[in-house]
């Protein structure tokens, strides 16, 4: 389970937080030292970090400094997302900070052609496509710019078709479940894996219990866990589990 679960650290204004359904006005701040958290997370193979300021187009040097410090202390692989929309920022994280993979969200939804070029330049192992979607009349519609707005693409499956055979890693978030501790959307992930079996899928949103994680193990490749790590004491339980 330690190899399946990817702990998440969300940074806003230099602080560790969790949002509720992507709402920046509903941020819970966790009074925990980054060093202490990273020490605990070293029990896991992977780590997911989000620069929430970057996700909504804001600069925050505090966040980038924290990410660089985490890289020095975390022993496993790290992926970073939030506002990564150009080659310069990708090279900064991959080459200067030595991050293992970058997560592209808004860019991969708004500009497929440019994203494909990036995948070919850096390799599919280095690029994670993050598609955050919301259920609108039983159709999962991608949202962009830190979940603040919808885009022209009206169906996640139409978007995935464009990357089929090109991209390898997906991070799929059901926004309505994010931060709610209501369980992952197994049905959505099952549909994606059935239609596009070549994608490596990371599930995100709503994961709150060990049972949630076990259910997701049947339909996805990884599960990103954020709020439940802090509030449901999952960290200790998973950390002592079998890989």
What are these model-derived regions, one by one?
Residues 23-41:
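Short catalytic helix/loop segments, enriched in acidic residues and glycine
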Residues 78-101, 187-223:
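Catalytic cores of alpha/beta
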Residues 58-79, 120-130, 183-209:
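Alpha-helix-loop-beta-strand connector modules within alpha/beta enzyme cores
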Residues 12-26, 99-178:
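Conserved anion-binding
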Residues 46-65, 173-181:
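Glycine-rich, proline-tolerant flexible connector loops at the mouths of alpha/beta enzymes
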Residues 4-8, 46-48, 77-79, 100-103, ...:
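Structural preference for beta-strand elements that scaffold enzyme active sites
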Residues 60-122:
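Glycine/small-residue-rich loop that forms an oxyanion/phosphate-binding "nest" at active or ligand-binding sites
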Residues 92, 96-114, 176, 205-209, ...:
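Glycine-rich phosphate-binding active-site loops on the catalytic face of alpha/beta enzymes
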């Amino acid at each position: 389970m330690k190899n399946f679960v990817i702990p998440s650290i969300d940074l806003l204004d230099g602080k560790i937080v969790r949002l509720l359904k992507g709402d920046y006005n509903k941020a819970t701040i966790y009074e925990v030292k980054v060093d202490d958290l990273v020490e605990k997370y070293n029990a896991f193979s992977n780590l997911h970090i989000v620069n929430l300021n970057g996700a909504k187009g804001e600069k925050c040097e505090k966040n980038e400094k924290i990410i660089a410090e985490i890289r020095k202390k975390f022993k496993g692989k790290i992926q970073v997302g939030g506002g990564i929309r150009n080659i310069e920022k990708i090279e900064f994280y991959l080459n200067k900070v030595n991050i293992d993979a970058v997560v592209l969200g808004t860019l991969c939804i708004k500009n497929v052609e440019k994203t494909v070029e990036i995948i070919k330049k850096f390799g599919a192992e280095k690029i994670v496509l993050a598609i955050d979607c919301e259920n609108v009349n039983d159709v999962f519609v991608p949202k962009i710019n830190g979940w603040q707005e919808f885009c022209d693409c009206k169906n996640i499956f139409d978007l995935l078709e464009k990357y089929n055979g090109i991209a390898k890693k997906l991070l799929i978030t059901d926004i309505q479940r994010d931060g709610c501790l209501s369980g992952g959307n197994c049905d959505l992930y099952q549909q994606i894996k059935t239609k596009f079996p070549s994608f490596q899928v990371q599930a995100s949103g709503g994961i709150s219990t060990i049972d949630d994680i076990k259910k997701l193990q049947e339909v996805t490749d990884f599960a990103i866990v954020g709020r439940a790590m802090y509030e449901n004491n999952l960290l200790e339980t998973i950390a002592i589990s079998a890989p």
